[in-house]
Amino acid sequence: TELFGTSVNTSYKFCSPFEVDKKFGSLGSFFNLELTSGMYVANPPFNEKIMTKMSNMLISQLEKKGEEIDIIITIPVWDSVSQKKYNLTDYGMPFQGFEILDTSDFLVEKLFLPKYYAYYSYYADKFISASATHLILLSNYETEKSLDVYKSRWKEVINSDV
């Protein structure tokens, strides 16, 4: 389930803040959703308030007993520690949304994706590098899931002629 999607860019179950998207299968706003057992993907708007609110909500959802929940999150590298670690411009700013996830007991794995790992924009018909990003896997149970499939896929994309 995509936690931040729209009817235009998803074919899976998705959450959207727009009431009209319910006609296309939206589950409604992520912030009103109760997570049940399953895999979720969160690629929120890159807005600090939204990402902090999302991080707090995800942690509270993962604290639920009886549900096996996995969540993959994509957020920008806006935290000073990572900016220094990866030799990026360090703006010296805290990034509470990332810190909540990074210090969580539910953190399974995180992966740094440099800015040159681009995404393909079908609207612009080209690859675009928006920001260096963190790919984070959270889980509330003993899982064997990892980000390995993403690591191997990124290597394929980088080494291709696309």
Which residues does each predicted region cover?
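Class I S-adenosyl-L-methionine
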Residues: 1-42, 46-162
